[in-house]
Every structure is written in C-alpha cells, then in structure tokens.
Amino acid sequence: MKKIIALIAALGLATTVFATREVTLLMDWFPQGNQSGYFQAQFDNQYHDDVKIIIKSGGPKINTTAQVAAGSVEFGLQASDSVMLANSKGAKLKGIFVSLNHVPYTLVYHPNTGVNSVKDLDGRPFAVKIGVTYWKWVKQKYGLNKVKEFPLKGDLGLFARTPQQFQQGYSLFLPARLDAKGVPNEQITVESLGYRPYSVLFTTDKLIKEDPELVQTVVDRLSISFHKSLVDPKPTRDFILSKSKKVNAEIHNNAIELMKQDFLPADWSKIGCQDPNRWVEVANQMKEVNVLPADFDPHQSYDTSFKKGCFK
C-alpha cells in the first residue's frame, strides 16, 4: 500500500513538474487578418506540451498596455508608440516581436472633392480616435489646425453620406470594406506621411527577467506560426471570418496580400525582427508633439535578443 501511495505521489509530482504553462496574448482589436500568425500559434498548441498559447481579442474599451503591465495577461499586441507612451508613465514594457513593419493607419476620403495632398483635408470633419498619437504628429507636421475632429464609431454610412468627411482606418481593411459597399474612396496612408510605428508584441521587464525561456519559446513559436499562416492561410482565415461580421473572404484575402507586399519582410524568416533606429525615430516624433518627455530613452522599450537571425 505504501508503494502505491509513493507511486501516486511521484506521478503527481511529475505532472506538476511537466505541466503545460499557459500564457495569454492580448490582441489590439477584434479578430482580423493581421493577427493570423497569432491565431496559428494557438492552433499549433496541439503540437506542443510545454507552452499553451491563448489568443484573447481586444477591442475599443480594452487597454492592452495597461493589462500587460498589471500582469493580467503575459503578452500584448500594440503599436510601438503606445508601448513607449505606457513606459513614460512607468509601465516597464518591452517590444519583443514585430508582426507588421508599420501600423496600417490611413486617412480615407471621398474622391473628386479637391484633395490633392494631406493639406487639403484641413477644415474638414474627421472621424478619429480622439487623442491618438499619430494624429497629433500629422496635425502638427502638416499644419492641419482647422480639422473638425469627432469620435470614431465605425459608421461607414455616415462617411458615405458626408462627401467632405475623412475617416481614420486601417489601410488593410477600410478601403476594401467601402469598396464592397459601393462607396468610392481614396486614401493617404500615415506611413507615407512619415509616421511609422511598429505593430509589436510586448511583455514586461519582469517576465523577461524572471522567465526568459518562456519569452523565447513564445517568440520561436510565433516565428514558425507566422510563416505557416502565410503558406496555408485557410485555417486562420476560416476562423477569423467566423468571428467577424465586417469582413468577407475577399477583403481578408486582400489584406493578406497587402501585408505580403508592404508590411512584411520579403524574407519571411525575418518576421519579428525590429530595428532600434525605428524606435528612436518614432520616439523623436512623439517628443516633437510633447507626448514623450525630452529625456525619454526609447532603447528601454524593446529587446532584440529573442528573435534570432535579424542582424546577419
């Protein structure tokens, strides 16, 4: 009897030692195509018994950086400028894996309304996420001081009925959604105006210090899953479309093709890599509009050590 009890105890200990570690990656929005690689990592849990990756959707009322900083989730997806803004307030976060070379912010407007450059948008109504950093920089850089800002609610009908209005969106999705509804549109991407924050997965300094092997495992898994989701996009596409009411297969497929053309490195093994100079560039732009203090150090907001093969 004692031997049986000892065996059960030993098995229990082994279960504890080799238990799968579960980590949550909080997205910056509802499920959409640019998150495909993350969802692929969740699908691939069946092939791994060490770390289980759970993808949690974000949304307009979810503060990703705050939740990661508080320890509610282990990892989050957000723009690199948002990571630095949070760090300027003491969050102690670090970007570890870049999933898009720049956040696809865009300004969508009606054609044939006298817009030949971004400066022609001055004085018009603008549906925007109030307080978003990129717009503070664009507004100052291009002297757009008469724009009539109002909170973005995603109402495409209002845009369709208001020829002078322009609207914030993602270049991967908004123009195609308007096309699908028969609403003529043109766009000026924020990246083309010179503001290019990364879309980056981040975690806490604390987790990096206490469990670097876990962080490394997540980055390694993502490097594989992003490549896999591009080679065979159907599983993640089917899942994302099952969760989305605003995007159809054509819009989703178009977004993936745009990502390949303009948002991902030609060498997919480099997906995840980040250039320190890009963090400095965006930090300097944020300082220009007094979003960051002059002495803020952007090098404390990223860690390039986990994504291998970036600097060969």
State what each model feature region is.
Residues D81-S82, L152-N248:
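Pocket-lining segment of extracytoplasmic ligand-binding domains
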Residues W279-K312:
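Conserved C-terminal helix/tail region of periplasmic/extracytoplasmic solute-binding proteins
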Residues M1-I4:
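Positively charged n-region of N-terminal signal peptides that target proteins for export
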Residues R21-P151, L158-G169:
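Short, glycine-/small- and polar/acidic-enriched structural segments
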Residues A14-V17:
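N-terminal signal peptide c-region/cleavage motif recognized by signal peptidases
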Residues D211-V291:
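Secondary-structure end/capping motifs
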Residues A41-Q42, Y105-V115, Y198-L214, D267:
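A bilobed periplasmic-binding-protein/Venus flytrap-type ligand-binding module shared by bacterial periplasmic
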Residues D50-I53, V183, K245, I271:
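N-terminal secretory/targeting leader peptides
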